[in-house]
């Protein structure tokens, strides 16, 4: 396995960078929540050394490219989950499709205890990791599901369905759209402005039923990269 390489970790420095990143994003978390975020990052590092959960192995890059990158989307995801005009049973429910090691679902669940997050992945070792995190971090508002999202049947539906590295917009909408509650939002995390993906949605005929509401730009602390959210809703 590729986990044999060892990296020295300065936990105190990483925690300071995490706290600075949270300040830059505008996420006001309690010290206990910051502790839990850092504990999650530590678990990700440890499990990744054995189970290859992510190709990113350096602790500094795990902090920036995974945790801070995901945390930038948390305010928008939480606001959409709380304010979506959905039925009572779907309110505050978020589905994270292709969650992998838990991004962005785990940071969202830690940051927003009033939001219920289900993280889905087809790789069993990844959902096993997420289930372990839920237990060790005492996250009663988080859960993991192993299997393809298109096979899930949930009558309540979700206020928000999100993905970070799951698929093209066309596949994201096609495979997971049936789980979105009426009035809910699909929110995909993307890099550069995904005009080509939006065009392919149009070419596939999906714009007859779906619309792009907004494509806000995100700024990730410590990363000089382009990041956007694509917010979709049913017409």
Swiss-Prot record:
Main localization of the protein described in the UniProt heading: cytoplasm
Pfam families: GidB
Record GO cellular component, one term: cytosol
GO molecular function: rRNA (guanine-N7-)-methyltransferase activity
Localization per Swiss-Prot or TrEMBL: Cytoplasm
Keywords, sorted A to Z: Cytoplasm, Methyltransferase, rRNA processing, S-adenosyl-L-methionine, Transferase
Catalytic activity from the UniProt record: guanosine(527) in 16S rRNA + S-adenosyl-L-methionine = N(7)-methylguanosine(527) in 16S rRNA + S-adenosyl-L-homocysteine
Keyword match DNA-binding: no
Gene3D superfamilies documented for this protein: Vaccinia Virus protein VP39
Enzyme Commission identifier(s): 2.1.1.170
Positions that bind S-adenosyl-L-methionine: 98, 103, 149-150, 164
Family (UniProt): Belongs to the methyltransferase superfamily. RNA methyltransferase RsmG family.
HAMAP family documented for this protein: 16SrRNA_methyltr_G (MF_00074)
Function: Specifically methylates the N7 position of guanine in position 527 of 16S rRNA.
Protein name: Ribosomal RNA small subunit methyltransferase G
Taxonomic placement: Bacteria, Pseudomonadati, Pseudomonadota, Betaproteobacteria, Burkholderiales
């Amino acid at each position: 396995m590729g986990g044999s390489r060892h990296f020295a970790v300065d936990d105190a420095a990483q925690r300071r960078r995490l706290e600075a990143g949270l300040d830059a994003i505008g996420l006001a978390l309690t010290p206990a929540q910051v502790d839990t975020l850092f504990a999650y990052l530590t678990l990700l590092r440890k499990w990744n050394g054995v189970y290859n959960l992510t190709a990113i192995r350096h602790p500094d890059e795990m902090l920036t490219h995974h945790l801070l990158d995901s945390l930038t989307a948390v305010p928008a995801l939480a606001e959409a989950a709380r304010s979506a005009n959905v039925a009572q049973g779907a309110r505050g429910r978020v589905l994270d499709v292709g969650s992998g090691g838990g991004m962005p679902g785990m940071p969202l669940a830690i940051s927003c205890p009033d939001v219920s997050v289900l993280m889905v992945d087809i790789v069993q070792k990844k959902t096993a990791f997420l289930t372990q995190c839920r237990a060790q971090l005492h996250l009663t508002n988080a859960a993991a599901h192993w299997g393809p999202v298109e096979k899930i049947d949930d009558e309540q539906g979700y206020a928000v369905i999100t993905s970070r590295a799951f698929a093209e917009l066309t596949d994201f909408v096609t495979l997971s759209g049936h789980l979105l509650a009426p009035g809910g939002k699909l929110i995909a995390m993307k890099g550069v402005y995904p005009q080509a993906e939006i065009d392919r949605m149009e070419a596939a005929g999906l714009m007859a039923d779906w619309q792009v509401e907004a494509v806000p730009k995100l700024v990730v602390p410590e990363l000089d990269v382009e990041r956007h959210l694509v917010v979709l809703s049913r017409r």
